[in-house]
Amino acid sequence: MRQPRHWACGVYRRPLLALLAVLLLLPIASSAAPGGGTVLSPPKPLTGIDLIDQHGARLTASTLAGQWTVLFFGFTQCPDVCPTTLARLAGVQRRLPEALRPKVRFMLVSVDPMRDTPERLAQYVGRFGQDFVGATAPLGQLAPLLAELGVSYAYTAQPTGEHAAHAGHGMPAYTVTHSETLYVLDPQARLYAVFTDPKDDYALLRDLSTWASSP
């Protein structure tokens, strides 16, 4: 299995030990075709899904059930990896066979809930697709899901003068470091596969098409 990739929108470079622990503790983990994600067998049930989407609706495992879900963790002020990854996911969505598109949900989960309000998430994810989902939750509520998935993130203070738009709002300037892993949940909202390389569009498209075609 390839070493998980990292992206620093700041200066953070800590390895994703938590993600590796999630994979290693599962009874069986088998790689998909070369270049694809790591498929978990059996899928891992998730108990920490408790989010608020861009419309203010609560998202839990029961509300996510019924579709395949591709999760990416980031934040709306990420300068490059987040918009690049979401643009790639939008391309994957467009290339899915039309009959399969309703079976696959693409979701950005913000690890910056202090700034990423539902309104801001709605504006942001709407740039990539009308049916893209943006969600977050207060950190205490978000933490169980991050821990279950082994999501790596950290806040880094920025030098005075950067992001001056926040001046006067009582919010210190900071950026967020986060991993760029993609997590695929099955229609029972269980962790089904992990893609450590979000740039491998072909593998993601191939695997999603196969999985969503299954009865």
Regions found by a protein language model. Name each.
Residues 3-17:
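Bacterial N-terminal signal peptides that target proteins for export
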Residues 15-27:
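Bacterial N-terminal signal peptides
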Residues 28-47:
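N-proximal helix/coil linker or "cap" segments that precede and/or mark the start of modular domains
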Residues 49-69:
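A short beta-strand-turn-helix
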Residues 62-85, 89:
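Short active-site neighborhood of thiol/selenol oxidoreductases, capturing the structured segment around
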Residues 84-145:
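Structural microenvironment flanking redox-active thiols in thiol-disulfide oxidoreductases
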Residues 122-179:
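Short, internal strand/loop/helix patches
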Residues 159-215:
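Thiol-/selenol-based redox modules, centered on thioredoxin-like
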